[in-house]
Amino acid sequence: RRAMTEAMTQPAALIAAARAAALNAHAPYSRFAVGAALLLSDGSVVTGANVENASYGLSLCAETVAVASASAAGRLADIVAVAVIGGLMDTHGVPTGAHVVNPCGRCRQVLNEAAQMGGRDLIVHCGAAEGDAVVIYRLSELLPDAFGPADLGIVQRR
């Protein structure tokens, strides 16, 4: 693995923020709650939870909700890391399970666009609803040779 930065070696707070966000998931169809937490360059954190819709294609992933929140705050280019957790909800709506969750392909692409705006290769902390298991990646490992604005001849402004 690559040399670890502080954000890579201390994911506990970011994972905890993602777990707290997952408690706000609206997942009545899959009963699979996902939480995401974005670490911004100033140390602040923006979170999101998945929002399902009866028209399944309109559902929103937790990472996309968090990225949209960062964008609404004018902070899209400030994202340096993301933590994602998920699990099946128990009867009280609390996510459970020790299976490590990764961002889906769509979310990887959305995160990549934000990463390019900030000129960063985001750190991605993949965790579980319960337990201490965390797998850490660079976004470029999860989305190699990514398609982005440059492929369309667009130069990103920071």
Residues covered by each model-derived region:
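C-terminal binding/interaction regions
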Residues: 5-24, 68, 77-158
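Basic polycationic patches enriched in arginine
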Residues: 1-2
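Short loop/turn motifs at secondary-structure junctions and domain boundaries
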Residues: 27-30
